[in-house]
Amino acid sequence: MLLLADMDVVNQLVAGGQFRVVKEPLGFVKVLQWVFAIFAFATCGSYTGELRLSVECANKTESALNIEVEFEYPFRLHQVYFDAPSCVKGGTTKIFLVGDYSSSAEFFVTVAVFAFLYSMGALATYIFLQNKYRENNKGPMMDFLATAVFAFMWLVSSSAWAKGLSDVKMATDPENIIKEMPMCRQTGNTCKELRDPVTSGLNTSVVFGFLNLVLWVGNLWFVFKETGWAAPFMRAPPGAPEKQPAPGDAYGDAGYGQGPGGYGPQDSYGPQGGYQPDYGQPASGGGGGYGPQGDYGQQGYGQQGAPTSFSNQM
């Protein structure tokens, strides 16, 4: 019964989750951050390396032809030692490696682990607590600040670990170790390197560190848009103002029926001359025209209601 109740709770959470956010840039980048953080701390924190060298003494019976030296994370190399023949009366000497590079390595792994945990928590919040996340806009603002902090921490930790890795390679190079071995400086003794440590996994961890830096810096923009702070910068440009008619244009100050320049009625051919009949007045001179004594009627066209001569004949 308890198992069934737990399954019901899980089903309710899954049903109420907004998994579409994983397809959006905000959620998809969080998934990438989560995965890349795992690769970053796994490739560094689980590393174990080994180098091999040989010491051939003048007295062949005292030689050690296959000396194996193992080291691992967190690279406190000053605590790593191996026994090498002193080439004097069958004795041995403890040889310690040089350097302590645990600070940069542990800092890098710590940032990766916390980034992994934060990405997982933020992704769960996006899916199951979307309303709480957007309530009062506090969720996006806190998310933005945390993303900015992690981006800075990835920059610092990746740079520090890249320098630390370079020092680890120098300290575990068999040639450099041989230079510090007193028996190898004695005449008649021969020291050789047999195998360099494989550091490809550590190189990969540095690459993942800077990839995480790119992801977290890029995600700043998507989280910034969720805060609403970008709204004033994303407004549409204002529309162009309407063009006002210039004074004197058509339908403007001198509009229809408002004198010269408009479209009001004017005398035929203008006031300067030309043929200008007035259909409402008698024709001058008593002769022709369209007045009362014309051929087509007894009165001009200006007098409405008067029958024409044609209508009288009808």
Curated annotation (Swiss-Prot):
GO terms for molecular function: cholesterol binding; identical protein binding; SH2 domain binding; syntaxin-1 binding. Residues 1-25, 132-138, 225-314 are cytoplasmic. GO terms for biological process: chemical synaptic transmission; endocytosis; modulation of chemical synaptic transmission; regulation of long-term neuronal synaptic plasticity; regulation of opioid receptor signaling pathway; regulation of short-term neuronal synaptic plasticity; regulation of synaptic vesicle priming. Ubiquitinated; mediated by SIAH1 or SIAH2 and leading to its subsequent proteasomal degradation. Phosphorylated by SRC. Residues 50-107, 163-200 are vesicular. Residues 254-264, 283-303 have a biased composition (Gly residues). InterPro entries: Marvel, Synaptophysin/porin. Residues 255-305 are annotated as: Repeats, Gly-rich. It is found in: Cytoplasmic vesicle, Secretory vesicle, Synaptic vesicle membrane; Synapse, Synaptosome. Residues 265-282 have a biased composition (Low complexity). Residues 239-314 are annotated as: Disordered. Disruption phenotype: Mice lackin both SYNGR1 and SYP show normal brain structure and composition, but impaired short-term and long-term synaptic plasticity. Disulfide bonds: none annotated. It is a multi-pass membrane protein. The keyword Membrane applies. The calcium-binding activity is thought to be localized in the cytoplasmic tail of the protein. This is Synaptophysin.
